[in-house]
Amino acid sequence: MKQNKRLMVMAGGTGGHVFPGLAVAKQLQEQGWEIRWLGTADRMEADLVPKHGIEIDFIKVKGLRGQGVKRLLAAPFQIINAIMQARAHMKRWQPDAVLGMGGYVSGPGGIAAWLSGIPVVLHEQNAVAGLTNQWLSKIAKKVFQAFPGAFPSAAVVGNPVREDVTQLDEPAQRMQEREGPIRILVMGGSQGARILNQTLPAVMANLGQDYCIRHQAGKGAAQEVQAAYQANNVANAEVTEFIDDVAQAYAWADLLVCRSGALTVSEVSAAGVGAIFIPFMHKDRQQALNADHLVECGAAKMIEQPDLTVESLTQQIQQLDRQALLSMAQKARSAAKLDADKVVAQAIVALTEKR
């Protein structure tokens, strides 16, 4: 017999889906809720979620974009099978609500919850809603969005961001007395970004000793990127595959050069760091739209990928002295929505109290 309320989180594929889900889960765990995850066995959630003390169930589901004719013809059967798998997990565990945070798993999981009479809560992290969330929004009891425009009438709450990021000191406390080389942090998301790996070593060669850099290269790319810095005679570069303590990295940085995935944009704002965004090219300009509000308020700069060259990025960085970077950081922090995890958690609690 159940003692506590239960939430099943549906999120997978990338850190942009998984980390916000973990932030909401933590809020509810602190209120005595039991949390279980629905994911896929071959994506990052399979390794990451159990490290946070949360048990995970798996279903077999893959994306359909870019697939051949045979895969597309088989897709309806695979989706039905995934829905049945998800429904079986829910029948066994009996959650009081499910939270869809995106990734391939959310579609079958959301439909399974709806068929089982379990309320669905959605959170869209990007400025352009994904196809799965567009469908699920029609059956969800509550829909949230991080940025305006994803849905016409959903509440804008920001993205749930990890507590260690939201609790960083204000930019002035961190940056006011800094001396020495300007600190550049490069992050291409949890998967890395090849164009940043290719461009930054030559940029650092142009910038010289007045700058130092920490570079997250992505899985399997650190050795190649380190060699590129060495080939450009850049001594003050630290290269890793993945940065484990992201909050500490934000606190260290004067400037971030990065993609503008939804979670990255929200973390940059919550941490209070000036940024130069290089959006991933996508037909709906999703990443560019994610970053627009920070660019418009003076907290960030943006270079669209077709315009990115060693020269254009070098020039943009050289225009930003420490005072300008502090101003950008303060504007970023002022634009942050720091309570998205609490707002979503409160909505889930309120929804289940009505049942």
Curated annotation (Swiss-Prot):
Q: Which GO terms describe its biological process?
A: carbohydrate metabolic process; cell division; cell wall organization; lipid glycosylation; peptidoglycan biosynthetic process; regulation of cell shape
Q: Which UniProt keywords apply?
A: Cell cycle, Cell division, Cell inner membrane, Cell membrane, Cell shape, Cell wall biogenesis/degradation, Glycosyltransferase, Membrane, Peptidoglycan synthesis, Transferase
Main subcellular location of this protein, as a coarse class: membrane
Q: What is the protein's membrane topology class?
A: Peripheral membrane protein
Sample GO molecular function, one term: undecaprenyldiphospho-muramoylpentapeptide beta-N-acetylglucosaminyltransferase activity
Q: Which reaction does it catalyse?
A: di-trans,octa-cis-undecaprenyl diphospho-N-acetyl-alpha-D-muramoyl-L-alanyl-D-glutamyl-meso-2,6-diaminopimeloyl-D-alanyl-D-alanine + UDP-N-acetyl-alpha-D-glucosamine = di-trans,octa-cis-undecaprenyl diphospho-[N-acetyl-alpha-D-glucosaminyl-(1->4)]-N-acetyl-alpha-D-muramoyl-L-alanyl-D-glutamyl-meso-2,6-diaminopimeloyl-D-alanyl-D-alanine + UDP + H(+)
Q: Where does UDP-N-acetyl-alpha-D-glucosamine bind?
A: 14-16, 126, 162, 190, 243, 262-267, 287
Annotated localization: Cell inner membrane
Answer whether the UniProt record assigns the keyword Cell wall biogenesis/degradation to this protein. yes
Q: Hey, which pathway is this one from?
A: Cell wall biogenesis; peptidoglycan biosynthesis
Q: Which GO terms describe its cellular component?
A: plasma membrane
Q: Which SUPFAM superfamilies match?
A: UDP-Glycosyltransferase/glycogen phosphorylase
Enzyme nomenclature, EC number? 2.4.1.227
| Top-rank lineage group of the source organism | Bacteria
Q: What is the purpose of this protein? A: Cell wall formation. Catalyzes the transfer of a GlcNAc subunit on undecaprenyl-pyrophosphoryl-MurNAc-pentapeptide (lipid intermediate I) to form undecaprenyl-pyrophosphoryl-MurNAc-(pentapeptide)GlcNAc (lipid intermediate II).
**Which family does the entry's similarity section mention?**
Belongs to the glycosyltransferase 28 family. MurG subfamily.
This protein is called: UDP-N-acetylglucosamine--N-acetylmuramyl-(pentapeptide) pyrophosphoryl-undecaprenol N-acetylglucosamine transferase
